[in-house]
Amino acid sequence: MVENKKIALVTGASSGIGSATAIELAQKNVHVIITGKTLSGLQVTESKIKLDGGTSTIAQLDMNDFVGIDRLGMEIFKRWGKLDILISNAAVLGILGPLHHQASEDFFDVININLLSNHRLIRSMDALLKKSNFSKALFLSSSMASTPKSFWGAYAISKAALNHMVKIWANENKNNNLSIIIVNPGKTRTKIRAKAMPGENEKVLQTPEEVAKKIVGLIFLNKVSKGEIFDILQI
């Protein structure tokens, strides 16, 4: 029964790492709330979860919809009264190229989804996480957060700012049981990677499933430093 399970929220769960992580969590007897912009992708994820005997709830959501994020938090409270696990995975690559060529609207779209929507998630889920005795939050970042690589513009900037924001939130919660960590998944076979590196040999990349197993392993690890950044390739 769902009442006896931990409750997790996974954003960007319609494909890639988000989908694989949701499936992996469900296999650990966690009820997973899966969000994403594409309903068909969420339905595929849900079908895979059910096939393995797991349970999930679809909450179709565009991360640009900040009011929708708030509404999701309220619905989670009404239905379950708490949130045990938050996996913030949703992100967009945007347009790669020189900064001075990037249109403001394209730049802001990346910042909105990769950074500001995460602030809204923190606002909406903080109290719910603190109602749990388990209380874990994990944010997917990128190696580009620490590497000012040419032409990665808004994406790299958004991930660098995300890391800083999450570390601040972790510091603000150093005296309670809410565990907050950041993960750099490394080179993985995802849509974002394919868009950024067209023609790359996929065989040399990790699969989303391989990354998901390590993410879920970190979630159930008893001792991690708050605000710590984990490089999946080194785990």
Per-region residue spans from a language model:
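Conserved glycine-rich cofactor-binding loop
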Residues: S14-G16
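Conserved glycine-rich Rossmann-like NAD(P)H-binding loop of the short-chain dehydrogenase/reductase
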Residues: K28-V44
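The beta1-alpha1 cofactor-binding region of Rossmann-like NAD(H)/NADP(H)-dependent oxidoreductases
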Residues: Q60-R71, S104
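Conserved NAD(P)H cofactor-binding loop of Rossmann-fold oxidoreductase domains
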Residues: N89-I95
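Catalytic loop of short-chain dehydrogenase/reductase
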Residues: V92, K130, F134-K174, K187
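Substrate-binding pocket helix/loop in short-chain dehydrogenase/reductase
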Residues: G97-L99, A103-I111
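C-terminal helical subdomain
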Residues: L178, I182-V183, T190, P198-I235
